[in-house]
From Swiss-Prot:
It comes from Streptococcus pneumoniae (strain Taiwan19F-14). GO terms for molecular function: GMP reductase activity. GO terms for cellular component: cytosol; GMP reductase complex. The keyword Nucleus does not apply. The active site is at 176 (thioimidate intermediate). It is an enzyme of class 1 (oxidoreductase). The gene is guaC. The lineage of its organism: Bacteria, Bacillati, Bacillota, Bacilli, Lactobacillales. It catalyses: IMP + NH4(+) + NADP(+) = GMP + NADPH + 2 H(+). NCBIfam families: GMP_reduct_2, PRK05458.1. It holds the Pfam family IMPDH. This is GMP reductase. Belongs to the IMPDH/GMPR family. GuaC type 2 subfamily. NADP(+) binds at residues 205-228.
């Protein structure tokens, strides 16, 4: 039962250092393998319209990073797969669970993407299980990610249906208001939910949402994530598709949730909101900084590679890691 587990989130945890065994953090290897491909970092930008478009996806793939293209340009998905494959790059797309998506999956047989993410807000659903089975039947070599979920039962059921990885996180994101609108979700205890789900998982877990700092990446790995999906930290870059808006002479980029009125175009089952983020520099600068911070984390763990973060001790500090530090 959940009540037997301690409940905590990212800001409640500090990882405990081990003796360093490398001469420089540059020796630490941040790469991670998911399916048949190895990527430079265990992070993936959220598959949201204000985070990435085809150009950003291409930039990420060329740089050796994992990406998941969003599903909100449905007609553009097959041309996108061709565009990526023509350049020798991996194709990674998203699908929903509506009836027409079944025909769409059949159309992919001639040029199957390497990765498909079944992407709905409440992924522990018969509709998702049915779609996993359909993709696995039609495209047996495609790596299927399914979500989002927040319980061990959901992880096991999606894995048993054929999912190659599950995405864990219901509403912990900065622009997700599922927790407020519905009363449900992993907001405020996302890291504990990840730990709970990871104990049941036999296949990779992608932690999705609630990441506010680069240190949260290391914490996610400690509690069982193979890959971490990140929204707000990847939003607001020069390359980001979100609109640039000027307020009092300052540049901001818009960032909105996948079920917001801005994305849906109407007040219809809205579970996302729009915020403005101060415009950042280039996406590559953030990726490089993430890599360096993760290398430092690996060195503090007394390790040489990402997996070494899984074995460190931790302490629950209940919101005290920011005490005396207003800079966060």
């Amino acid at each position: 039962m959940l009540n037997e587990f301690p409940i905590f989130d990212y800001e409640d945890i500090q990882l405990i250092p081990n003796k360093c065994v490398i001469k420089s953090r540059a020796e630490a290897d941040t790469s991670v393998t998911l399916g048949n491909h190895t990527f430079k970092l265990p992070v993936v930008p959220a598959n949201m319209q204000t985070i990435l478009d085809e150009n950003v996806a291409e930039q990420l793939a060329k740089g050796g990073y994992f990406y998941i293209m969003h599903r909100f340009d449905e007609a553009g998905r097959i041309p996108f797969i061709k565009r990526m494959h023509d350049q020798g790059l991996i194709a990674s797309i998203s699908v929903g669970v509506k009836d027409y998506e079944y025909d769409f999956v059949r159309q992919l047989k001639t040029d199957a993407p390497e990765y498909i993410t079944i992407d709905i807000a409440h992924g522990h659903a018969d509709s998702v299980i049915s779609m996993i089975q359909h993709i696995k039947k039609e495209l047996p070599d495609t790596f299927v990610i399914a979500g989002n979920v927040g319980t061990p039962e959901a992880v096991r059921e999606l894995e048993n249906a054929g999912a190659d990885a599950t995405k864990v996180g219901i509403g912990p994101g900065k622009v997700c208001i599922t927790k407020v609108k519905t009363g449900f979700g992993t907001g405020g205890w996302q890291l504990a939910a990840l730990r709970w789900c990871a104990k049941a998982a036999r296949k990779p877990i992608i932690a999705d949402g609630g990441i506010r700092t680069h240190g949260d990446i290391a914490k996610s790995i400690r509690f069982g994530a193979s890959m971490i999906m990140i929204g707000s930290l990847f939003a607001g870059h020069i390359e980001s598709p979100g609109k640039t808006i000027e307020v009092d002479g300052e540049q901001f980029k818009e960032y909105y949730g996948s079920a917001s009125q801005y994305q849906k175009g109407a007040y219809k089952n809205v579970e996302g909101k729009r915020i403005l983020l101060p415009a950042k520099g280039h996406l590559q600068d953030t990726l490089t900084e993430m890599e360096q911070d993760l290398q430092s984390a690996i060195s503090y763990a007394g390790g040489r590679q990402v997996a070494d973060l899984k074995h460190v001790d931790y302490v629950i500090v209940k919101n005290s890691i920011w005490n005396g530090d207003a800079s966060h």
